[in-house]
Amino acid sequence: MKYLLPSTAAGLLLLAAQPTMAANTGGYATTDGGNVAGAVNKTARSMQDIIDIIEEAKLDSKGKKVKGGAYPLIITYNGNEDALIKAAENNICGQWSKDARGVEIKEFTKGVTIIGTNGSSANFGIWLTKSSDVIIRNMRFGYMPGGAQDGDAIRIDNTPNVWIDHNEIFAKNFECQGTKDGDTTFESAIDIKKASTNVTVSYNYIHGIKKVGLSGFSSSDTGRDLTYHHNIYDDVNARLPLQRGGQVHAYNNLYTGITSSGLNVRQKGIALIERNWFENAKNPVTSRYDGSNFGTWELRNNNIMSPADFAKYNITWDKDTKAYVNAEDWKSTGTFASVPYSYSPVSPQCVKDKLANYAGVNKNLAVLTAANCN
């Protein structure tokens, strides 16, 4: 089932329309990005413009490099790469071997916000390395090239305090032959790894993605706190996320059309899975592929309350070749520590009925509250 997300009026998404308290992310992130005193506002029409703006912000007035950046940035992106996205859509199996395209934000800790205008689009990714205090909003990422070069849409490495909000990320949930595992399609939508923590992923529309996202790079990269809320995952294969250790709070998400596995809690991680809507999903909550060091979960007030609901919502399960744990009894296997931030989740039914009006791009950053559920 495809969720058709309605749009608000087209045109520029004005910075003046942004909430004044960007730090209220509804999750572990507490960043204002570049929305702080002393910020410089720039407009970018292309990927290269964004690269140039960020590199310029690393230098002082005398052209000397400043550690962590010279000033905070607010970058408004108004480019349109629909033609590249359409060409990639018409040549899915040719994208893997192409050069990856992306903006790398490296060693920039002064704060940066990248926000797309309504109607903008990108056939390139944004990759964060050893930075902090970054916000990415209202960006539409489609059919990233360069899967063989780790061409993620959003990659967060060694970067704490990040907010990924109101974006659309899409490709084709499809396998092309060509490698030993027959996986020559696209890389991840959002990978969060290498000691990155305090990240909030909210109000994104992610569809047609095979490998949605990592939480952790390896069995030793396990210490992080992440929140996923009010996201729509539609026609996706797996990794919602693939969680290696740490803590994940997933609330008010809509999971539909999961073709392999959903929240995969591994390496003794724990997930609080709260007031979500699951439908047409295979292995929506599981711990698999490791064979040991299983993670645990606390299931709280989702639309599924017991195995008696599986048939109603078309929830199915299968086995793994290694030892595994599925939530086939739909019982909690752990207790999540108290959540250190305030949040106001709506009912799963409201998520099902209303979230499409708020998640994704061109929504002027609107949020879903209980008042909108009636």
Swiss-Prot record:
Q: In which pathway does it act?
A: Glycan metabolism; pectin degradation; 2-dehydro-3-deoxy-D-gluconate from pectin: step 2/5
Q: Which GO terms describe its cellular component?
A: extracellular region
In alphabetical order, the GO MF annotations are: metal ion binding; pectate lyase activity
Asked if the record carries the keyword Methyltransferase, the reply is no
Q: Which reaction does it catalyse?
A: Eliminative cleavage of (1->4)-alpha-D-galacturonan to give oligosaccharides with 4-deoxy-alpha-D-galact-4-enuronosyl groups at their non-reducing ends
Q: Where is the active site?
A: 239
Where is Ca(2+) annotated to bind? 150, 152, 187, 191
Q: Where is the signal peptide?
A: 1-22
Where is the major localization of this protein? secreted
Q: How is its cofactor bound, per UniProt? A: Binds 1 Ca(2+) ion per subunit.
User: Where in or outside the cell is it found?
Assistant: Secreted
Under InterPro entries, the record lists: Pec_lyase, Pectin_lyas_fold, Pectin_lyase_fold/virulence, PEL
SS bond partners = 93-176, 350-373
Q: Name one GO biological process term.
A: pectin catabolic process
Q: Which cofactor does it need?
A: Ca(2+)
**Record keywords, A-Z:** Calcium, Disulfide bond, Lyase, Metal-binding, Secreted, Signal
Q: What class of enzyme is it?
A: lyase
Give the EC number(s) under which this enzyme is classified: 4.2.2.2
Question: Its family?
Answer: Belongs to the polysaccharide lyase 1 family. PLADES subfamily.
Function summary: Involved in maceration and soft-rotting of plant tissue.
State the name under which the record lists this protein.
Pectate lyase 3
What is the organism field in this record?
Pectobacterium atrosepticum (strain SCRI 1043 / ATCC BAA-672) (Erwinia carotovora subsp. atroseptica)
Q: Which gene encodes it?
A: pel3
